[in-house]
């Protein structure tokens, strides 16, 4: 174990000397996909609860599609499937984008987490007390102002416990990135195992890294919940 750490601690944490690897790469994939997925999911969640079918149904189809298929397959489609289409390779911009493994991986991860986050936020919007909305309307708020100042802030706070689970699941899901040759923590562990044949130690180090990051994320979300969801607790 000590010899393995002495040789591979840098690749496991941040770099192999030439590229970003290991934990740094995993955190980059997680952050990029979560930020994109979060931003896109806000308007999609509003559309998801729309009373207009032509607005609601396309979003519903998208969320069912990406929640109903494995992320591994979604990554393979983005990484190899789309680039195999001649029309994609014929367009310089699309050709450059889908030739890059990082672009394909972030795209697949972002689309996947966006689908789950959209449903989380949509559920929080539906669960809002009707009285809150009526009170806001009584103050003259309507349309986008009603969503911007009342509905979405309340929905985002209430959905925090569920969104924290999605973040943790997304962290664990980044392990499929090695499929696209992305040097994340699992890819470094596989390379270390191939070079040293120390299977238990190689993957054990990877497991410890994921466990530590998970504990940190859980702690941060618990702090956020105590701060932003205090109004839901019992009155003293």
Model-predicted regions and their roles:
Residues 1-236:
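Transmembrane alpha-helices and adjacent helix-loop boundaries
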